[in-house]
């Protein structure tokens, strides 16, 4: 009777719903592995699981006084990670047909992301040959019973969902020692837990994701600032997004690709989201290219309108572009300010309270954005990403990192590059972190000063940029930095060394390409290995195609939710060419992408770039190739 009453209370207070197949818990050998986000996790499992499980509780918690009261209602077995006898007890319970609940993290998260995973839970599953059933709680981390006070905005009774994921078999790894088998099993369980998060990610558009962030982190939470030094909250950013959408719809059609030739600034961000919410497709143009390159991009994506700023063109000495490229309609921001009417202002005010009403009907798999890459053949191609692929890469990054509302990003890499766009804009904006947008990464003295002045905790850059920042910066300029990510070119040893010696900071390397939105692999503090570009991101499949004459490694092919919809090529701009590859038998397979890179992947999943294929891929790359780095360097020419 008590349990029935408590179930009713929780359903009413937290609007709790249970999703997934509960029949999985009837498996004769079952290990249940929930994420651990609050003190209520165990209570809800006790109340809403269709079975009566045994709870394996780490001994430092199980021996506390209040657990004696809890043990009256649920069966508890203390689990000591370093005591093999405790593991044997749980294995025997599983063999008796008793379902076991183990929190693999061993403690409540203090970051909002997965904490480290203890090997004990994985070893129990591997020894007993039990199926692993991941359970994810969403919403409990926003309650007062979490440990995220001061980091996230907490609510008294947020909406809570308990999601049950498909059962997975965790086999005993092949290794020479029990210690290695235990470690590899733990890494496999970590992978299962990360994939569980990816499997339960919301399916939405990029504008809907902005609204979710606004609700989660607070409408008046500061989120973005540029060189005007006027910081916008989520609410004031939404106001600018609505204004941009209202204006853009006057001279564009739904489904049309709009070219944006703008620097890193809040207005650029507002234009991207504003175009998207009204069903337009932003095409982010490279303003460092010449008129010929710009014409190619316009032709490839069938762009009829370019939105830019006279002030920007004049400052960067780009006025010749509008004079030489005459086949499109040039729209200037300065001309649009005077066109806003009273009716427009009332429309914006209304939709500031009801923003979803401003959206046109869209699906997550619809075209969301066009980026451009020249690849190895130096011919411009349009890379079309959907809402789902962009947000999948954001979720992959959030799954392996712990970015939170206390962080502040220095985003100086151009937004027309996938690295700058996804890692420098979408990820922090949707994580509640603040962003400072700076238009030129080659201002080697200014960027470190701004990092210091703005108390930035995350910095993105290339090896060359980071090296020059290190030489120009005062030793205390980077005192608040806790994460430095290098991409686009190989991270040089001397760059690593000067950052370690002068600032005591380890630079994290990654690997990616525009077609993957862009991150494919990334070293993070929890999972890092020197000489590699990190592990392949969760929810991505990979395979190595053997290459004649190469004994170690192979050509990397990928498939995952962050993959582009396809290419736009000059030969047929109206045709979207889906990704396709030849497998090792020479058969064509769609939905796979050939990176052209020769890599090796060790037993722990760490990826090492061995050679360069047609894409000029290199170690530490996070977007495109050699041509992208050259493009970035051209930014300085206008200064």
Curated annotation (Swiss-Prot):
Q: Can you state which reaction this protein catalyses? A: a 2-acyl-sn-glycero-3-phosphoethanolamine + a fatty acyl-[ACP] = a 1,2-diacyl-sn-glycero-3-phosphoethanolamine + holo-[ACP]; a long-chain fatty acid + holo-[ACP] + ATP = a long-chain fatty acyl-[ACP] + AMP + diphosphate
Query: In its keyword annotation, does this UniProt entry include 4Fe-4S?
Result: no
Q: Show the SMART domains listed in the entry.
A: PlsC
As recorded in UniProt, its EC number(s) are 2.3.1.40, 6.2.1.20
Subcellular location per the Swiss-Prot or TrEMBL entry: Cell inner membrane
The record, for InterPro entries, names: Aas (IPR023775), AMP-dep_synth/lig_dom (IPR000873), ANL_N_sf (IPR042099), Plipid/glycerol_acylTrfase (IPR002123)
What keywords are annotated for this sequence in UniProt? Answer: Acyltransferase, ATP-binding, Cell inner membrane, Cell membrane, Ligase, Membrane, Multifunctional enzyme, Nucleotide-binding, Transferase, Transmembrane, Transmembrane helix
Assigned GO CC terms: plasma membrane
Q: Which residues form the active site?
A: 36
What is the name of this protein?
A: Bifunctional protein Aas
